């Protein structure tokens, strides 16, 4: 699949997730089969660009793969400025967030709250597309609530405004992440527009990935929460789509190597104070299927020193192996 002039190595994309899809996680997912990874959203508020968190999000030098950066906001000019700032700092694709259902984002009339206001959406899309010379994509939801699903209208508007690919999550804003994603709306959008459509929502297995692609006719899949603690899910899905067979479960020692590599990368990227704290949630995701890990997770979450975290993980896997 192509977005503008950029050819993805496959049609599996890492969804932007605040506090998750930082550079270490993106690099890991790309290594294990993702065709592209979208960065966590950056606020269009320029007052926040100078914070240490925003500066870290803008570190793209030497990053592998296509650099897609997501921006969020509701003011057309500020969104245009944020897009330009992102491109100046290495973004090759700009993604506009109109899908986040979080109250923190929606109370500022950003994310999926914008779905109530197509006129503002049009102003934002035109402003961003006209502000940069790179492809602009849009991530959104099926509508505001089940009685107000306007994704086909928004998709047509996006195409008319010059958006070059659209990712659609199969839930409304009101649904948050409850219940199950539905794919009829994604199918309807795919039938209504000619730009690439990327299906998103509950794609948590190779079999589900194949079903969603075939049912919706989507050009690509975007995977978010199922990749938390399982970045190799992209490899599993790609193998299944290519060969029709499922891969064997990764050996425990390989999972250990992936996790230790990820935790070390977090320590290096964020430093000795923040790194161990951010590593905690990732380790929790990696071990969520381990029945024997609940007590270990409580112990691990109390460890503040990076070397002690590595030592604890080594010890945990030694115990599992024995």
From Swiss-Prot:
Its Enzyme Commission number(s) read 1.3.1.-
Q: Which GO terms describe its molecular function?
A: flavin adenine dinucleotide binding; FMN binding; tRNA binding; tRNA dihydrouridine synthase activity
Which annotated residues bind FMN? 16-18, 70, 139, 200-202, 224-225
Superkingdom of origin: Bacteria
InterPro entries from the UniProt entry: Aldolase_TIM, DUS-like_FMN-bd, DUS_fam, DusB, DusB-like, tRNA-dHydroUridine_Synthase_C, tRNA_hU_synthase_CS
Q: Which reaction does it catalyse?
A: a 5,6-dihydrouridine in tRNA + NAD(+) = a uridine in tRNA + NADH + H(+); a 5,6-dihydrouridine in tRNA + NADP(+) = a uridine in tRNA + NADPH + H(+)
Q: Please list the cofactors this protein needs.
A: FMN
Sorted UniProt keywords: Flavoprotein, FMN, NADP, Oxidoreductase, RNA-binding, tRNA processing, tRNA-binding
What is the main EC category here?
Answer: oxidoreductase
Q: What does this protein do?
A: Catalyzes the synthesis of 5,6-dihydrouridine (D), a modified base found in the D-loop of most tRNAs, via the reduction of the C5-C6 double bond in target uridines.
**Protein's UniProt name:** tRNA-dihydrouridine synthase B
Q: Which organism is it from?
A: Vibrio parahaemolyticus serotype O3:K6 (strain RIMD 2210633)
Name of the gene this protein is made from: dusB
